[in-house]
């Protein structure tokens, strides 16, 4: 391929970047239309190693990429044009950075001479994501810059990266080649002559090795640590960390396993899942206050009561295990932080505690709460908690569950039922925003091809209405369960000093339903007001090969009134 003209060299650079990313483990590329990113777009269109996903809204596109990366546990590339298109990725990049999800942004940009002079669609893109991405600024393609310099730059930026990378790609016009035929990375090209060996192989140009040594305590340290009354608290764990190993660890030491909604163990029968509620139970709380040792796996705990318990307790020893170099200790109590995966740490040489089974009575208290929830939620008034418990009990091994922020994830954390197994569970709890939740769930569903359920509030769904266009293109089941309580009713749980202020400035009632939105995107839709109809609609949707919507309409105060009543019963237990 001849390389004299700018459009051709632009295209070659785009193809080199995409080819190297594929060799570095990228499986998916998410693309939004735009002119300045044309060299990347045309290269991606011919790249057979990547699955392409297209969407017109960059904010939703970024969250879809986040979901794909969460599900695949591999980096995902995103291609956007210049200007505010890049800025629209910011919320997804923030979430990805905080939760160690590798996204690679490839942003088309104007050349240097068109920046800061009033040229159209030109903003300062380098550093646009501030502290939330590793930044790489590529020059405009130049035949005097060796192609291997481009490859080594990409390799250094992406290799072993567990967080977002922003590669800003400047291109001069013309952007469109006169024709698009043949192989872009032509072995006969004089410009590519230094890459002849690389072109014939399938590995990255530069391979970075990483000798990761497990950060682990000594046998003596373990023996001293378990010599007392302790608890194991499990926060956010990704599915591949094999949290089942923590069940065995709990049983070996003889300490109770207290599990968060994001632990992949919230519903496990061997875990104490109702910890948020047990901390309101007088006898259970008194018992838990006897603990003087704690082993915390993961971070970003959901329950304020659990966070408060960890902060207020006078711990003799506080160990935390994190898979990455992170600071996830808002109570500032952790005395030892070990960097290891949960299953690696659980496989160490642990000893039976001298106070094994000291808190076995928690099982009885946990069972009391289970019976209370069956009577007052499952057999009570139709509402949000009842729907969430029904979803959590339905075919968990066959599906994966994405739980939306605000009220849904808290209801799941407080009231999820004990089950023989738990669906693989996902959340966006890095920055805990209510934007992009549907798009993230679409990305998860698109990668796995497995039935996926999304539990989402009405305001969250309104935030991400555009992403119904992504959902429309899915070929695997995605059940979008919208809990419509007409506004931000999590604020019913917060001490807003005046009911009128709560209504006018926090709850923001809208009076909207989602039937017309479903019709606009040609998605199956059901509206239900009782458990039997919900269960029928839900089972039907799990078997539908595509996305569908179930809208659950409840009164504004239903969930908050039920929570208040249940809290009162628990406190009087």
Swiss-Prot record:
Its EC number is 2.2.1.9. It is an enzyme of class 2 (transferase). Keywords: Magnesium, Manganese, Menaquinone biosynthesis, Metal-binding, Thiamine pyrophosphate, Transferase. Its cofactor is Mg(2+); Mn(2+); thiamine diphosphate. The keyword Metal-binding applies. Binds 1 thiamine pyrophosphate per subunit. NCBIfam families: menD (TIGR00173). Belongs to the TPP enzyme family. MenD subfamily. Catalyzes the thiamine diphosphate-dependent decarboxylation of 2-oxoglutarate and the subsequent addition of the resulting succinic semialdehyde-thiamine pyrophosphate anion to isochorismate to yield 2-succinyl-5-enolpyruvyl-6-hydroxy-3-cyclohexene-1-carboxylate (SEPHCHC). This is 2-succinyl-5-enolpyruvyl-6-hydroxy-3-cyclohexene-1-carboxylate synthase. The gene is menD.
